Swiss-Prot record:
Pfam families: Rota_NSP3. It comes from the Viruses. This is Non-structural protein 3. It comes from Rotavirus A (isolate RVA/Human/United Kingdom/A64/1987/G10P11[14]) (RV-A). Homodimer. Interacts (via the coiled-coil region) with host ZC3H7B (via LD motif). Interacts with host EIF4G1. GO terms for cellular component: host cell cytoplasm. GO terms for biological process: regulation of translation.
Length: 310
């Protein structure tokens, strides 16, 4: 189990977030414009440096690890820490650290009065109220028991100079900024809605055009299919008619068979191929007619006959 270590890490992370919020809130109250990412980066760098350089982070995580080990039944580390804390050298070192911290606080302008007051009193905020409760710490109770607390009756109320803040003007400025931001957001939203409507209208019109074109394509396809069927029927009837007409004529059987084979070779299914077949058949008929004419012409000359066209 590492629940205590996780809790300590969570407390450290929460402290960092609180430091960021405190920094940004202070800048906002002072009316200073800032970049959140820059503030976040600077606070994180300083916070990590202080926590690492001072050893506070490692100290907290180490104590949390010791508690987790004790909870898991491993008391060796806890016993060593207890012996270390009870050692006189450790106590002397802690006194030195406390004295160093006091001198550091004094150098930062935090005098003894402020340190004592902060150690003796704490403020408890009342939820939902502007007032607060001042609580005495255990140190204050010990001082009262030891008689180290006195009441100063010669206290003279001095007029404190307080910097007044015009909250009304501040509120009006914030309200103007909010209205300006709201107007810009509304303008962007309105323009986006108009663009979306235009895109939808274009899409609907395009869909209508596509539907109309698909309908026209379907009509043309139906018309083409009908034409193809009509041509197939026409070609089939033409072949049958020519075949019947040929059989009714007094032609030799070989010629009828040849013409019948050519008629049967016509592609009735595909009109384009049928036209090519008809062209070939007509060419053959013309060629046969030309040959017959030449034979007849030669025969007339051999018989000393002449021919004329009327």
């Amino acid at each position: 189990m590492e629940s205590t270590q996780q809790m300590a890490s969570s407390i450290i992370n929460t402290s960092f977030e609180a430091a960021v919020v405190a920094a940004t809130s202070t800048l906002e109250l002072m009316g200073i414009q800032y970049d959140y990412n820059e503030v976040y980066t600077r606070v994180k760098s300083k916070f990590d440096y202080i926590m690492d350089d001072s050893g506070v982070k490692n100290n907290l995580l180490g104590k949390a690890a010791t508690i987790d080990q004790a909870l898991n039944g491993k008391f060796g580390s806890a016993v060593r820490n207890r012996n270390w804390m009870a050692d006189t050298r450790t106590t002397a070192r802690l006194d030195e650290d406390v004295n160093k911290l006091r001198m550091m606080l004094s150098s930062k302008g935090i005098d003894q009065k402020m340190r004592v007051l902060n150690a003796c009193f704490s403020v408890k905020r009342v939820p939902g109220k502007s007032s607060s409760i001042i609580k005495c710490t255990r140190l204050m109770r010990d001082k009262i028991e030891r008689g180290e607390v006195e009441v100063d009756d010669s206290f003279v109320e001095e007029k404190m100079e307080v910097d007044t803040i015009d909250w009304k003007s501040r509120y009006e400025q914030l309200e103007k900024r909010f209205e300006s931001l709201k107007q810009r957001v509304n303008e962007k939203y309105t323009s986006w809605v108009q663009k979306a409507k235009k895109v939808n209208e274009n899409m609907y019109s395009l869909q209508n055009v596509i539907s109309q074109q698909q309908s026209q394509i379907a009509d043309l396809q139906h018309y083409c299919n009908k034409l193809e069927v009509d041509l197939q029927n026409k070609i089939s009837s033409l072949v049958s008619s020519v075949e019947w007409y040929m059989k009714s004529m007094e032609l030799p059987g070989e010629i009828k068979t040849d013409i019948e084979q050519q008629l049967n070779s016509i592609d009735v299914i595909n009109p384009i191929n049928a036209i090519d077949d008809f062209e070939s058949l007509i060419r053959n008929i013309i060629l046969d007619y030309d040959r017959i004419f030449l034979m007849f012409k030669g025969l007339m000359r051999q018989c000393n006959y002449e021919y004329t066209y009327e």
